[in-house]
Amino acid sequence: PKHAYLAATSGMDFIVKIGRLNNLSFSGTKEDGWYIPEAKQAMQAQTLAYAGKYNAPDVEQMLAGDCDLAIESTMILHNPEVKEQLETCGIPVIVEHSSYETDPLGRLEWVKFYGALFDAEDAAEQLFASETAKTADVLNEAPTGKTVAFFYVTTNGGVNVRKSGDYVSKMIELAGGTCITFDDSDEENALSTMTIQMETFYEQAKDADYIIYNSTIDSELTSVSELL
């Protein structure tokens, strides 16, 4: 594809890293929704245009810009009529499932998918090899015993945390830590996060060795006092 539409946000970093950002013409995310500098810069330079969210794409704009592929996340499966509309208009749709990967290295390996898609397989293989090499020493080390709370506070005051089977929790484990979780590890649920009351979070996280605030979802914090 030379003029793709990207609604699967998790793919942007891979696309940038393999040098294929110029193959994207349309974004399903607005400029202020990107935390990847290259994506923001492309939208500022108007080489990447916002063409509506995944569930309400501007098909006319995409057709006028010769869109030749829509890269969707599994969210599009909740709106099959949108996928059908794009395909009826001659825009192929591919649904990537990287969000279903619970293993951090499994998620990383999706760079090979994008390498194959954008004819950059060598770059993708090199990136995967170099990044996995960085983890080799860490994976051979014994667990540190340190506990980690990974979260953000929602607009209504709840606390969003990762579930025990989520890739972020597993990434913390791979790094030698123990992610504080609040769910039943045997629970069958496709969601990777859950929202709990602040009191519940505080009770279990107050003695954590480290707290990591997920500012990619919410606005950044500059001090601990902002949590109070």
Feature-to-residue mapping (PLM):
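Short, structured coil segments at secondary-structure junctions
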Residues: 20, 89-90, 175-176
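Flexible, glycine-rich surface segments
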Residues: 140-225
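Solvent-exposed, acidic/flexible segments
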Residues: 7-8, 17, 52-56, 75-79, ...
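Extracytoplasmic substrate-binding proteins
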Residues: 47, 60, 64-73, 77-158, ...
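Short gly/pro/ser/thr-enriched loop/turn and capping motifs at secondary-structure boundaries
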Residues: 31-35, 100-104, 218-220
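A short, structured surface patch at a secondary-structure boundary
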Residues: 1-65, 69-76
